[in-house]
């Protein structure tokens, strides 16, 4: 009798749970059909999947196995893979060393080498431990502690831990010169970007550069920015390429604007070497040689040298928090290449992306065609990932020991924990939501090639996703 009662209780709970799931599925279906009927989309341009976070059971799906451009929602796959393969406590180490010898007068007959590890946070202002001036001062102090008063060699930024191709395949040329298109170096510095403020003039007249946050005196900056009407805002774009010696600024800067525009730095490793040389000179240490980046030196051979000091990055969990909260593309490219380097000893973005694809094929049997990754950030419009693949990887994360750190890294948007993605004609959201019935849900929603304004489509997507809260 007791067995019969317990069995009846179990099946009653199961029946109620299934009823909730069916009810939610019906609501999502109705909302999705309404979403599509409002115009601006075809059947093939919208994909949605919703599943139970604990069991993986699919609650609703539409076009979930169609490859879609993801924009920055791809960052969740990079984040989860990094947590899984590198660990929450992983840290990068940057080493400064010297070659040659130091004589009794304090002359170093050799070079100072800054050996990069791909750390994307070095010199970033997001963490107390990574502030650029503090790092320069610490290294300068360590050099002086060795009794070095003059360096008869060079200051070299060694960025050779990666392949030197800073920009992944498929990134639009118009993006590369701007802060969000900053390429990844083996020795990143100040998030590989520089801030510029302008002095507006009469409408249509040149807007002069007022201030630079970084010393770019070694570059040729061609400024073609004009003053725009009040209220027109920031329409300034930077144009450059990795390792270039010049930057072109075009567009308009609103007459009433008071804003810092950020552009990418063509050679971050050189910038760091340049800044350290300047800091040493300011502190009384003479440097006879030039600042240089390893990739631009002919026949550079890395030397072990004698260690002067090391710098450790924040933990991976701390890096991924800002990576997802502020959608920093540089962080994604550094993490992807780091995964490839640590797991497979490869240096390129393509090889690293292929390793990530192979990992999820082996771990979750996700077809390789469902994970068309060309970068780690989602900036490439040519990325193609199915909603099902992204959803399965996110659902997998729910059971992992580092899940709390990943969940914390997701922004709160529309009162939901999810990562957004936006590039031309593409909007996406991927995240987690608990329904009123207490069911924990994982979801991925993409729209591609939509018509109408981004703001309007975003609100329509929020309205659809709000059903998951019911």
What are these regions (language model features)?
Residues 35, 85-367:
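Conserved serine DD-peptidase/penicillin-binding transpeptidase domain
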Residues 47-51, 59-61, 78, 95-97, ...:
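Soluble periplasmic/extracytoplasmic beta-strand elements of cell-envelope proteins
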Residues 21, 55, 119, 162, ...:
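Short, glycine-/Ser/Thr-/acidic-enriched flexible segments
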């Amino acid at each position: 009798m007791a067995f019969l009662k317990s069995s009846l209780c179990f099946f009653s709970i199961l029946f109620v749970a299934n009823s909730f799931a069916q009810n939610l599925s019906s609501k999502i279906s109705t909302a999705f059909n309404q979403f599509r009927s409002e115009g601006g989309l075809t059947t093939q341009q919208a994909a949605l999947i919703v599943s139970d976070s604990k069991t993986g059971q699919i609650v609703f799906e539409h076009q979930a196995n169609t490859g879609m451009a993801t924009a920055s929602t791809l960052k969740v796959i990079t984040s989860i893979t990094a947590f899984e393969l590198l660990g929450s406590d992983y840290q990068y180490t940057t080493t400064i060393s010297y070659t040659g010898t130091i004589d009794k007068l304090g002359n170093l007959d050799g070079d100072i080498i800054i050996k990069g590890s791909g750390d994307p946070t070095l010199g970033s202002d997001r963490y107390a431990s990574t502030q650029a001036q503090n790092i320069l001062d610490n290294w300068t102090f360590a050099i002086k502690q060795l009794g070095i008063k003059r360096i008869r060699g060079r200051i070299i930024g060694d960025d050779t831990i990666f392949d030197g191709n800073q920009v992944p395949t498929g990134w639009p040329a118009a993006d590369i010169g701007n802060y969000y298109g900053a390429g990844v170096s083996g020795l990143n510095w100040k998030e590989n970007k520089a801030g510029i403020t302008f002095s507006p003039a009469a409408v249509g007249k040149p807007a002069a550069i007022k201030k630079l946050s970084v010393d770019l005196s070694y570059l040729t900056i061609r400024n073609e920015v004009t003053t725009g009407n009040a209220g027109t805002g920031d329409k300034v774009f930077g144009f450059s390429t990795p390792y270039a010696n010049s930057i072109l600024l075009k567009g308009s800067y609103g007459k009433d604007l008071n804003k810092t525009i950020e552009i990418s730095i063509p050679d971050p490793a050189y910038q760091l070497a340049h800044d350290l040389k300047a800091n040493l000179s300011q502190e009384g240490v003479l440097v006879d040689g030039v600042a240089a980046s390893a990739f631009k030196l002919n026949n550079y051979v890395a030397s072990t040298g004698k260690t002067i000091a090391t710098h450790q990055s924040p933990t991976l969990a701390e890096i991924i928090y800002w990576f997802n909260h502020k959608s920093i593309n540089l962080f994604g490219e550094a993490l992807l290449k780091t995964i490839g380097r640590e797991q497979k000893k490869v240096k390129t973005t393509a090889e690293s992306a292929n390793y990530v694809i192979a990992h999820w094929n082996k771990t979750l049997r996700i077809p390789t065609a469902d994970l068309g990754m060309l970068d780690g950030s989602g900036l490439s419009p040519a990325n193609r990932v199915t909603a099902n693949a992204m959803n399965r990887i996110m659902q997998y994360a729910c059971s992992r020991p580092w899940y709390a750190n990943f969940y914390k890294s997701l922004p709160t948007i529309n009162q939901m924990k999810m990562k957004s993605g936006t590039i031309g004609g593409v909007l996406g959201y991927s995240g987690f939501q608990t329904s009123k019935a207490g069911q924990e849900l994982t979801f991925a929603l993409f729209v591609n090639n939509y018509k109408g304004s981004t703001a309007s489509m975003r609100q329509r997507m929020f309205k659809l996703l709000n059903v998951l809260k019911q």
